[in-house]
Amino acid sequence: MGEFNEKKATCGTVCLKYLLFTYNCCFWLAGLAVMAVGIWTLALKSDYISLLASSTYLATAYILVVAGVVVMVTGVLGCCATFKERRNLLRLYFILLLIIFLLEIIAGILAYVYYQQLNTELKENLKDTMVKRYHQSGHEGVSSAVDKLQQEFHCCGSNNSQDWQDSEWIRSGEADSRVVPDSCCKTMVAGCGKRDHASNIYKVEGGCITKLETFIQEHLRVIGAVGIGIACVQVFGMIFTCCLYRSLKLEHY
């Protein structure tokens, strides 16, 4: 009877080892996906960060990159701990899983909270940023972001093209008689912003605030879903690790 129980325990341990190994392979790929989403956000979707008053959007992306790197390292450690049957490595693996779990939950929560606050932030800050910093010394990033925003989303100003009447650049005389930036034009050529007729600029299409809000919210949903989704998967990894740790402990005795 004792021999049967021993074989049963050994069989259970082997099954847990292969289950955890399979999980770690999937976990490593998930880490790659998390890191890719973070890098994708920073590299391709961060053009408009200079227009945001808060750094939450940027912080969320960085958290995902860090979490993704740690996940990939942890996945390799998990495979080593599983096949070497080292309980000290399993403890370290569990702790790292817990840290990553918390990082991804934080990223998901930040994305959700910022998603709720974004409309208020843009209403309070976007117009001021555009009219006070556009083409001002030291704010080249803002100028580039505004031009790209207006061209990409076919809009002009924060709420509408009239916002540019308050622009420090327009009022300074440096605008060379322009009433709106050239990036407001449907066909962008040098000096086209001197004529603000609806046939020339994005006047009836409205301002950029709603379009920028929609753009950022879409990416916050992706960030939040990836963070929370991978965190939920990690719960299974922690359960498998605890089971294998307990199984090895029983075999030891």
Curated annotation (Swiss-Prot):
Disulphide linkage map: none
Molecular function, one GO term: integrin binding
Lipid-anchored residues (S-palmitoyl cysteine): 11, 15, 242-243
GO terms under biological process: cell migration; positive regulation of cell migration; positive regulation of endocytosis; T cell proliferation; wound healing, spreading of cells
Gene3D superfamilies reported for this sequence: Tetraspanin
Topological domains annotated Extracellular: 40-57, 113-221
InterPro entries for the chain: Tetraspanin/Peripherin, Tetraspanin_animals, Tetraspanin_CS, Tetraspanin_EC2_sf
Transmembrane segments: 19-39, 58-78, 92-112, 222-242
Function: Structural component of specialized membrane microdomains known as tetraspanin-enriched microdomains (TERMs), which act as platforms for receptor clustering and signaling. Plays a role in various cellular and molecular mechanism through its association with both integrin and non-integrin proteins. These interactions facilitate critical cellular functions, including cell-to-cell communication, wound healing, platelet aggregation, trafficking, cell motility, and angiogenesis.
Protein name: CD151 antigen
UniProt source species: Mus musculus
Name of the encoding gene: Cd151
